[in-house]
Amino acid sequence: MKKCLLFLTTIALILSLSTNAFAKNTSGDLSQKQALQLALSAREHFWNTMSGHNPKVKKAVCPSGTFEYQNLQYVYMCSDLGTKAKAVNYLTPIFTKTAIEKGFKDYHFTVSKGKLAVPIGDGDNLLNWKKSTAKLISKKGSTITYEFTVPTLDGSPSAKRKVTFVKENKKWKVNQFDAVI
């Protein structure tokens, strides 16, 4: 009898803990800390995609050379992001589907010879997102907007950036490809 009671108590405890963890994981809220973490991840994914390579992937093959298309100089993406499907797969955990589609269009990504290519750009900026602060400015259903105050690396005045997060497939995502640059 004692074993049965101990077993039932253990099961009840496990169920209550797992239910609690599940509730926290699917919470409707996106905290300031979570918003900043997601913004930092979006920034990293944006710049990695614009440079054509995720540096965390070892042994990716990066083609050399450039080509011109519609008066823009392009470079092929490295093998880790070398097809549209691979790049979309890399961006999907962070950005909404709409943000990815619009980003590919706005930034003139193209497919040439079966490979994804990106226009050659000028690189990063002087915003220090790691030291930014977030303020909730709008919350409507599955859409939350935070305004970030982002200090600069060179000491000039901080920049203000509004970033909208949308819950897509039960996960918060950034709703604009270049929101965190």
Curated annotation (Swiss-Prot):
The keyword Signal applies. Induction: Negatively regulated by the two-component system YycFG. The keyword Repeat does not apply. Keywords: Signal. InterPro entries: Endopep_inhib (IPR031841), TA_system-associated_sf (IPR053749). Residues 1-23 form the signal peptide. Pfam families: Endopep_inhib. This is Uncharacterized protein YoeB. It comes from Bacillus subtilis (strain 168).
